[in-house]
C-alpha cells in the first residue's frame, strides 16, 4: 500500500472516531432515568402472639413510577439518588392467620442515596455497582377486613442499600437502563387492637427499568 493510501486510510479512520459519540461517562456528567420500579419484599413480621401463636403479617409486591439521578464526580465514580411515586402495599395475614387475607394497606417512599462505580469501556454497555443508605417513610396506613376500624402505625426506618445496574447507551445522550437494588427495611408497627409493637422486616429487592438522558 502506498504512503498516500496509508495516509488517506489513517485520516479516514481518525475522522470516523472523531465523529463517533463519546459514550463513556466523564466527570461532570449527569444522568436522569425515569421508568417502572417494582418493590418485592423478602421478609415478614415477627410472630404476633398477641393475636395468635404463629400469627404474622407480610407486605405484598408493588410497582410504581421510579426516577434516578446520578452525578459523576470522576469518569468512574458518581452519586446516585433513587426516588419514586409512592408505593402502595397490601398487608396480608400469614402463618396461622393466613385465612384472614388482606388486613391493611400502607404507602411508602424509599429515597435512597448510593455511591456508584461505573465500569467505563469501549462498548455501548456501561455496568455499575453502588452502595449507600435508604430512608423509608411510611404513611396512609389503613386497616381492613378482620382489623377494620383499628388504627395502624408503621415507623419510618433507616437502612443500608446495594445496587447493580447497566446502561445501554443508544447515543451520546439517550440510554435505556436496568437496575436492581437490595434495601434493608426493618421497622416496627402497632395496631390499636393489639397490645405493644411488633417487628416487621421488609428487606425488598427493587427492580427498575428505565429510559435515561445524559446531560
Where are the regions a protein language model picked out?
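Predominantly the C-terminal beta-signal and adjacent terminal strand-loop region
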Residues: 88-92, 171-215
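Cleavable N-terminal export/targeting peptides
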Residues: 1-28
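Hydrophobic alpha-helical segments of small multi-pass membrane proteins
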Residues: 111-113, 129-135, 156-166, 180
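Short glycine/proline- and aromatic-enriched beta-strand/turn motifs that initiate or cap beta-hairpins
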Residues: 22-69, 206
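Domain-scale selection of a single, long terminal region
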Residues: 2-12, 61-71, 77, 85
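Outer-membrane beta-barrel translocator domains and adjoining extracellular loop/strand segments
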Residues: 44-51, 90-99, 139-150, 188-196
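Gram-negative (and chloroplast) outer-membrane scaffold detector with strong preference
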Residues: 27-29, 42, 68-144, 204-215
Amino acid at each position: 500500500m502506498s504512503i498516500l493510501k496509508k495516509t488517506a486510510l489513517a485520516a479516514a479512520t481518525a475522522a470516523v472516531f472523531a465523529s463517533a459519540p463519546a459514550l463513556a461517562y466523564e466527570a461532570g456528567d449527569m444522568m436522569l432515568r425515569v421508568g417502572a420500579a417494582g418493590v418485592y419484599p423478602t421478609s415478614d413480621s415477627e410472630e404476633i402472639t398477641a393475636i395468635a401463636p404463629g400469627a404474622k403479617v407480610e407486605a405484598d409486591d408493588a410497582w410504581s413510577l421510579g426516577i434516578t439521578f446520578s452525578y459523576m464526580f470522576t469518569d468512574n465514580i458518581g452519586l446516585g439518588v433513587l426516588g419514586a411515586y409512592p408505593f402502595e402495599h397490601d398487608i396480608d395475614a400469614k402463618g396461622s392467620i393466613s385465612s384472614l387475607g388482606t388486613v391493611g394497606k400502607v404507602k411508602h417512599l424509599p429515597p435512597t442515596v448510593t455511591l456508584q462505580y461505573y465500569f467505563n469501556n469501549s462498548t455501548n454497555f456501561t455496568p455499575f455497582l453502588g452502595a449507600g443508605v435508604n430512608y423509608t417513610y411510611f404513611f396512609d396506613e389503613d386497616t381492613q377486613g378482620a382489623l377494620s376500624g383499628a388504627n395502624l402505625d408503621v415507623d419510618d426506618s433507616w437502612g443500608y442499600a446495594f445496587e447493580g445496574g447497566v446502561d445501554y447507551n443508544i447515543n451520546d445522550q439517550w440510554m435505556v437502563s436496568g437496575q436492581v437494588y437490595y434495601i434493608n427495611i426493618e421497622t416496627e408497627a402497632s395496631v390499636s387492637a393489639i397490645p405493644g409493637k411488633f417487628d416487621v422486616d421488609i428487606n425488598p429487592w427493587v427492580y427498575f427499568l428505565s429510559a435515561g438522558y445524559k446531560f
